[in-house]
């Protein structure tokens, strides 16, 4: 009778979760006020509300949602184009129209039909192609507030039009509508619970369109936050939208918010509203498609009743396969890396293996002879309740599931029970135990107040729960025995070292001591230790459990079963059963599984550093707040982050969590993975690097501190795979050194820097530091400057001389360091900068000397003065003769070098003695060093020639040559800059070097001393002029010596190839344009004959690039070509003029300024007649500002034309000027007046007949300007210099 009552109560309780399986749902407005029909416990089926009684459309479908006034997506699509047609003639007209629309929509005092028409006008503009204009997107951002106001309007028609307009914008613009969508979605959600059907359905339809077409991750939190709304209709719709989002979006768009999605769906499955639960279950399938691992973890974290409801829904929708299964490939690095939670039944041999009641299981094993561990990762009480629900009235008796009759992974097994349990054969054919029905009945004698069976082996304790009743332990049933000895489960030996997945006990759960082992103490079987999970080091609490059973050593694992599983099952049997043969046989079975005769030490657990070695903590003391079911519990449960698992994806998900404690746990798990030398795959590394990049800014102190510890291990294990991430790593650590951190945290940052310096190639670090030092996007604080400089200094001490490269970035960085030696705000920066210069000088003296020789004299003086002072302070010798031209080698140079190192020094002598270079590195005293430095100083001051190799460096970088630019350590190798090929350091090479240095007298070429930044724009990265202004460089554009003749054909081909990457590779194309600008000033006629047409067309095409700096640079290059080679434009004058004038309407001032400069040069480069014939039609037909630019250009052309030619062209010139004199733009009118003044200056009174159309006031004004020009009083007017020609 008791069983029948329990069954009825449980069925009544669980029926609510089984309804609405078909997915039908009422409309949002109606369901908000629906009163559920009463249910009678006696007959729950007859009284239940039918799920389809308030039918509605399926989620996300375009069908009508019922009711008068409702709109659907078909209505929206029709309304998109059902608008008045308009035409857009110019961007200015479009801007004016959008401004008017914004004005109307921003003021709710306007009539509602005007606001509705304004919204339609936006759609009209979209249909007319407004999205093709750049200005449209600028004004669209300004419309965000107006659209939000319209969506809040009290007029339903205005709201409807606003929703349609927003949907149309999303459809047309896609992800470009990200900002607008993010702003409008919260307002659209406010429409969902509106009682006016047209408003509610319009808002829902608009959200659907946005989800389908604007895939922006920032929308996900906006949707998930509404899944916990107090409004039931909003929650229902939110899960509907979430389902649509999971169907439509790509996985990469969801990855950032995977944890939020999982948590939201879990809350939805537990939602108080039945229909919201149905919608949440639908989203589970979408989640599984994107994140199978997270979906499986979510499923296993649900209570059995919710698992059953989810399973029932998935079955009804034909998606049983979407439930988690453990036979997925475990090789995937991110999705299924040996998942600890799997749901497949263990069926090694169906004829001999008995099943268990479980939602989770262990992996299937194809080898029937191997042992399989039992599973203990479920709440058996809950499982028994689920079993009672599925049994449909059958009482829970002694029984087992016929696992052999089920397919692997079949969830139908949860619904079946058998009526008896017979003997279970083991792998050697013996029957271990035979349990009868009366034994099981003991466990079913109690039900709780909610009618659920209390049959359980191990419950999942909640914080603060106490299971102190002595009878509680004694009510456990044979299910515990089923999982121990009576029902053996085979396991794969490959998973032998994995611990069982018993859910972690929480907080302060405790069971009173008297009942713990009240039955097991008289057993004749040796009792194993059961203190598993948390040692003293890892546990925060200690146990009061002092029972003798703790003194036993644990069983040695290693024979195919997890020790925690054996312990939990055998101890459960001892606790539950009376002393006798049943207990002994059950425990003996567990002992046989472990084979205690084996003395082999088990493999260490993955998280052993936390005291979690599988047999290290048998005697550990847990705290008084901790019981057998918490951290140090007898069931072997351990904290989540200490599980013996290889699921790296789970660890990474925790590291990426928004919850700080989960991030900390993830870092703990990651530390132990790394300390056990668990290497990560390429995909895992990429994801972890992204997570770590964000963690540099982690706001939680404990997480950041642990992150720094983990980072050290990460670098040590994966240093060979992290070179691509080194820039981020190094720069972020250096920035942190400048932050206000605790001393302990600062020490950890310093340790990470030390490990980084030791782990990566020195040359790579050096290049990154040089790049970071001159990065114009960074504004380092004084502390960061000190950190950078100290790191460079320390790095220089361990670098090999060949690691120091004289590249453009190095030159710029050294210049920056020299400026830091005079930092007025910090003496620490000054000292650190001085130390860096000295370290670099000592690292590679010849190369550093060459570098200083390329810098302006100001920098040379500062550096050499510093080096003199340093040597004067450190040396005890006196200054030697200036005629001793010893050059100083690097102190750390290899001792077996056979050829000398020479620096580009120039001495007061005309010849260099070979003996002067025969020295021993170790025997150089401070006097020699000082003498060497004096020679270096003189060389720098007299240095007026760069080696041809150095000169050609910015033009074409040869990797082989670049490698050779530094000092070589092999025998017979000399500094390539020392003249070359001498393998034995012979006199000819040195004489060649000396003659090279003396080939030009001091200042023989004025340009030889000028520093040109373009010469050093090599392949590392570009540097703009602002970078050089800070270093006070000479910014002339002078180039190489005139006698430098190089074949640039290959280079031009490479540049053209790079420039053809339109809208891509912005930085690389900047470099290419700078290089091209240099080439324009060289007289390489053969190159220009071959490539001019291609260069011109590419430049003109680049004027349409999306990057404004690229457009501006292209105009500057065009200007340089016009200035140096104007004759080549004869056949391309019209095209060039048109493109240059069109650039004047660019929205960026920098581009317009460059266009004005190019037009000015163009006016003086092309023949006047040709130029005027091109300009006249443009002046008459073009709009502002193109016509203004054309008039100004024509004015410049007229100034250089002869009187006869101008008289001939006057009939073509005057109509445009007369027309422009009437223009609505005052600037155009003014430009026409100046142009007429210029014409008058050339031809005089012959102009008057052509002015007959002008009114008296205009003639009067024109005469006034003409008189001013003639008297020279025009001042700054462009006609002021015309008076001499009149």
Curated annotation (Swiss-Prot):
Residues 341-352, 872-884, 893-914 have a biased composition (Polar residues). Residues 66-317 are annotated as: TOG 1. Residues 642-873 are annotated as: TOG 2. Residues 17-67, 320-374, 411-473, 493-564, 605-638, 870-920, 944-989 are annotated as: Disordered. A motif (SXIP motif 2) lies at residues 523-526. InterPro entries: ARM-like, ARM-type_fold, CLASP_N_dom, TOG. A motif (SXIP motif 1) lies at residues 500-503. Changing residue 10 to S: Impairs Golgi localization. Residues 1-40 are annotated as: Golgi localization. Residues 53-67 have a biased composition (Gly residues). It comes from the Eukaryota. Gene3D superfamilies: Leucine-rich Repeat Variant. The modification Phosphoserine is found at residues 14, 20, 322, 333, 336, 374, 376, 413, 461, 465, 469, 484, 495, 513, 531, 535, 570, 572, 581, 614, 620, 884, 944, 947, 1005, 1021. The keyword Cell inner membrane does not apply. HEAT repeats lie at residues 179-214, 215-251, 256-293, 702-739, 764-801, 1046-1083, 1090-1127, 1208-1245. It holds the Pfam family CLASP_N. GO terms for biological process: cell division; cell migration; establishment of cell polarity; establishment or maintenance of cell polarity; exit from mitosis; fibroblast migration; Golgi organization; meiotic cell cycle. Residues 864-1286 are annotated as: Interaction with RSN and localization to the Golgi and kinetochores. Phosphorylated by GSK3B. Phosphorylation by GSK3B may negatively regulate binding to microtubule lattices in lamella. Residues 417-431, 605-616, 947-964 have a biased composition (Basic and acidic residues). Residues 1009-1286 are annotated as: Required for cortical localization. Belongs to the CLASP family. Interacts with microtubules. Interacts with MAPRE1; probably required for targeting to growing microtubule plus ends. Interacts with ERC1, MAPRE3 and PHLDB2. The interaction with ERC1 may be mediated by PHLDB2. Interacts with GCC2; recruits CLASP2 to Golgi membranes. Interacts with CLIP2 and RSN. Interacts with MACF1. Interacts with mtcl2. Interacts with MTCL1. The two SXIP sequence motifs mediate interaction with MAPRE1; this is necessary for targeting to growing microtubule plus ends. Two TOG regions display structural characteristics similar to HEAT repeat domains and mediate interaction with microtubules. This is CLIP-associating protein 2. It comes from Mus musculus. The gene is Clasp2.
